[in-house]
Amino acid sequence: MALVQSDENDFHALREAQRMVDSCQDFADHLIVAEFLPHCRGVAYINIRTLEQVIYCVQLSRAGYRIVSYEFDDVADEVANCDTVYESAHQLLAGISPLYGEKYGFGREPLGKRKEKQS
């Protein structure tokens, strides 16, 4: 789920956020478009509770996904200044959820297949 757009006018943050939520629902304990933060064409917010039960509010913009708080529907100044931007939803989830990487094998062979080969 990379943010690849052919034209600057094609990007619509809220639509992309909903698409990410719909396609990645199984990869987190809770995943929803933020309800109480303002969205615009260029910026939307997503609430995530990882498989480890860690809470994040993530900003989605043309640049990618960026953590802005450790609470739902919140932008914390000290967190919002974070420079880490993830280009795709799967990079974000792999970066914040070790269980996601183990369970779904992002960037490597899925754990189940590795165990089968070892047997």
Swiss-Prot record:
* Family of this protein: Belongs to the GSKIP family.
Which named protein is this? Protein GSKIP homolog
Pfam families noted in UniProt: GSKIP_dom
> According to the lineage, what is the superkingdom?
Eukaryota
Origin species? Drosophila melanogaster
Gene Ontology terms: biological process: regulation of canonical Wnt signaling pathway
* One of the record's GO molecular function terms: kinase regulator activity
Upper lineage? Eukaryota, Metazoa, Ecdysozoa, Arthropoda, Hexapoda
A single Gene Ontology CC annotation of this entry is: cytoplasm
